[in-house]
């Protein structure tokens, strides 16, 4: 199977997000890459489910709390930008201050 670089990147993010989800379920705090991957995957999957850009921008702020990430991660993530595929095309979703 041949995958484009963009498709490989999406699979890598998805794999990291699954690991992050498992760690969250075990009560572990996420590090920076895990938190970014988790938020990114949820936005991509939300777009696939038919949510709007505005809905995903709001949803992205509800995914993680400061208690769910390691010290310093909140200060590192000021915004998350994701190119997601919607039913009407690819759009950029930006979530400002995603971890409360």
UniProtKB/Swiss-Prot annotation:
Intrachain S-S bonds: none
Species whose genome carries this gene: Marinomonas sp. (strain MWYL1)
GO MF annotation: an example: nickel cation binding
Subcellular location: Cytoplasm
EC nos: 3.5.1.5
Family: Belongs to the urease gamma subunit family.
Entry's Gene Ontology BP terms: urea catabolic process
Signal peptide range in chain numbering: none
Hydrolase recorded as keyword: yes
Pathway info: Nitrogen metabolism; urea degradation; CO(2) and NH(3) from urea (urease route): step 1/1
Protein name in UniProt: Urease subunit gamma
GO cellular component terms attached to this protein's record: cytoplasm
């Amino acid at each position: 199977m041949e995958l484009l670089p963009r498709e490989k990147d999406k699979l890598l993010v998805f794999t990291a997000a699954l690991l992050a989800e498992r760690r969250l379920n075990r009560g572990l705090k996420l590090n920076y890459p895990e938190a970014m991957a988790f938020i990114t995957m949820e936005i991509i999957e939300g777009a696939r489910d038919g949510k709007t850009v505005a809905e995903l921008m709001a949803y992205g702020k509800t995914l993680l709390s400061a208690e769910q990430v390691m010290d310093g991660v909140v200060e590192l993530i000021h915004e998350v930008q994701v190119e997601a595929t919607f039913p009407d095309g690819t759009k950029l979703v930006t979530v400002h201050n995603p971890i409360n």
